[in-house]
Amino acid sequence: MAGTTGERPFSDILTSIRYWIIHSITVPSLFIAGWLFVSTGLAYDVFGSPRPNEYFSNGQQEAPIVLDRFGKL
């Protein structure tokens, strides 16, 4: 029972002016929105990750060294 699904062929979609008008606006908008999301620092606030200058406190400016991994906490 072969047949068609009634959908438009992909080649018709790609050659359509309407497709390119819509996507020439939405695709760059997504990149700009993503860039603003990261560059403004909103991504740090939304996901709760520390900003680059907040990884270590003022008293500790380097990564901690684990000396007793299996010891009691």
Curated annotation (Swiss-Prot):
It is found in: Plastid, Chloroplast thylakoid membrane. Its cofactor is heme b. PROSITE patterns: CYTOCHROME_B559 (PS00537). GO terms for biological process: photosynthetic electron transport chain. Coiled coil: none annotated. Heme binds at residue 23. It is a single-pass membrane protein. This b-type cytochrome is tightly associated with the reaction center of photosystem II (PSII). PSII is a light-driven water:plastoquinone oxidoreductase that uses light energy to abstract electrons from H(2)O, generating O(2) and a proton gradient subsequently used for ATP formation. It consists of a core antenna complex that captures photons, and an electron transfer chain that converts photonic excitation into a charge separation. PANTHER family: CYTOCHROME B559 SUBUNIT BETA-RELATED. Heterodimer of an alpha subunit and a beta subunit. PSII is composed of 1 copy each of membrane proteins PsbA, PsbB, PsbC, PsbD, PsbE, PsbF, PsbH, PsbI, PsbJ, PsbK, PsbL, PsbM, PsbT, PsbY, PsbZ, Psb30/Ycf12, at least 3 peripheral proteins of the oxygen-evolving complex and a large number of cofactors. It forms dimeric complexes. This is Cytochrome b559 subunit alpha. It comes from Bigelowiella natans (Pedinomonas minutissima). The gene is psbE.
